[in-house]
């Protein structure tokens, strides 16, 4: 019964949801209308705000492109493919694949949100080998597993609160840092981790479609060169018909080995000096060095990177439009206004709920946890401080931590209903197919509704 609802929601999304780029345009126009009618900004001022923000995500967009293609290139190596072949000895039915992909995706995203690319190529390779998998639903499983990143080591808001001299302290919103013991190490966050690790895989298995499968093999519209021509064969075909120094350089081990050794030395130094400090830059570097190590020669790695980068156009040109929306929300004051309205109606009992709703709603216009919290965080924290007036400082800090976590949880769950971060998944999962975000999102409606109810109850009932 529930799986039938998932199919109906999917059909509805296919009929109503436009391409991800059109969705970004519609969000832009919605932000423009809000700034004009609510904030009484002039059209020229709104356009200036849009342009001022338009290029704010260039660095982040480039990081996302690199995390996708360096991660995907690792999956194209013989070593990884042989490892996945061995894995299919133990995981060989669609139900096992759905369960395993959600479980491993949740665990990897707890380490870093960039590790979703590993989940993507693992899921795709399993789908190529195991019959009966509904591939659009498998993509939904991968994306849903991404929810756990806000609970883990790369969660932006808790790390910000624990950073000395952060902008909240500099602007007098906070007078001290909020330790991660109040956020990532809290009872509430540990319970949320348990929800994702133990409940999410079971939930997605229960909601799996019962209709005839749409396998990856059926959905492929172009020949997958990754499976028809090996990287080694292509590298060999590019050699000149006579002995040449250039071919020896292109296909030799020595040059690449030097770079790999240098990279491994730095990676070792990084973790020795900084512990388990995983930001996007070091992850990209690790993926790059590991890819070079697995592919062995410069030419093989060039071919792998070329194959991995064929489907990243969505990230390249859509992220600036989302940055433009962020600019309108930030520079027109619209995001601040929305946060103020929601914070004003909160009480000592309901403030986590309103923080959660704020995080979820504003995320549609500012789909970046750090960028969103820069807009809504000060208003929410000031409201919580007012509600906690007269209480011990430790208790107020706990309230601030709970409100901040609630924003993060709401932001993460609402990601499932908009395609911004799905742009990380589709270049790998949808390569060679005509699949769009609208083919995936319907399968996420029921899981999102279930998690919305459960998460709201948890943030209202559980202590920090």
Where are these regions (language model features)?
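Core transmembrane alpha-helical segments of multi-pass membrane transporters/permeases
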Residues: 16, 20-29, 50-78, 277-335
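Membrane-core helix-loop-helix motifs of multi-pass transport proteins
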Residues: 122-216, 399-403, 423-458
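Hydrophobic alpha-helical transmembrane segments of multi-pass integral membrane proteins
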Residues: 90-125, 316-331, 343-387
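Early transmembrane hairpin of solute transport permeases
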Residues: 57, 63-167, 365
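Alpha-helical transmembrane segments and their helix-start/interface "positive-inside/aromatic belt" motifs
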Residues: 9-25, 56, 96, 129-144, ...
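Long, contiguous bundles of hydrophobic transmembrane helices that form the permeation core
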Residues: 2-11, 167-300, 429-439
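Alpha-helical transmembrane segments of multi-pass membrane proteins
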Residues: 94-108, 119, 132-154, 160, ...
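Hydrophobic core segments of alpha-helical transmembrane domains in multi-pass membrane transport
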Residues: 23-37, 64-72, 105-106, 143-153, ...
